[in-house]
Amino acid sequence: MKLTYKELEIELELAGLLAVEELVLTQGLNCHAGLTLKILIEEEQRDELVTMSSDAGVTVRELEKTNGQVVFRGKLETVSARRENGLFYLYLEAWSYTMDWDRVKKSRSFQNGALTYMEVVQRVLSGYGQSGVTDHATGGACIPEFLLQYEESDWVFLRRLASHFGTYLLADATDACGKVYFGVPEISYGTVLDRQGYTMEKDMLHYARVLENEGVLSQEASCWNVTVRFFLRMWETLTFNGIEAVVTAMRLHTEKGELVYSYVLARRAGIRREKEKNPGIFGMSIPATVMERSGNRIRVHFEIDPEYEASEKTKYFTYAIESSSFYCMPEEGSQVHIYFPDHDEQGAVAVHAIRSGEGAS
């Protein structure tokens, strides 16, 4: 059924709802879009609604400025009913469909250096139906020799890949399936904000760690928190007091019975980030089987991978010499461990050969 709340229309795959009392809609860089609702209901429908609400879809449309454009699509995650001052309310929490990518931690490797980043992304998303990605960062670049997803959800892994280009994973919360922008898109509707009240922030630590080394001026690290009385689209480029800025976060919420639109605006050149690494691999080793040898290097089939993908650009790992008095390269079919001395998988080396049929020492 459909309910109208201020300038928004909320459509839920539920019946028997009376009125929306409160709403909070949030979105930002590297985040799923989230929606919470407080809805007045009849007492006798309380238990039925809580039971029926699991995985129900929810759509929010903006009626005033965009003439019904979808601003959020997702599905319910948590539902509860409460009695307050003699009335019964349903409390709902929903997330964009990208949340499905963030539920299960997975481990696998990508060792074919001929793969592009987008080919890896498509492989990662292949199990999510119509989910997809729009590339605004890679320019068709190939991966380094080796990528490792280890005990990471697909969302976290893709977020980390985006950081290889100094950019972010941005949820497209308007689609009825999981979709993202890989990097900040260039979207403009000609919006101009003049003489708006705001607070300005400048993250000098972020500037020193990320932007300064790229030759970006310090003023590019500025961002503005603005509150307006109308809807702005996420990721759109607009003119703010004569400055070109991008909408990088929003929070629509109820305040004293009114719907308040709060946004963060940032200069495009300042929307950069450090390379994200996987803290879980530091000092870790993964069992593998030797598939090929070349000098003091080996190609391996990781135990975490269902099959070995042979190619001309499959990663060779250097085999580390563990003893100065005795040196013997492992044979094909031998068991080894791939050791990760730090948080970056690119530093991995092969160690500790075990002949087939022998136990680990």
What is the predicted role of each segment?
Residues M1-S361:
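Amphipathic alpha-helical and helix-coil boundary elements used as assembly
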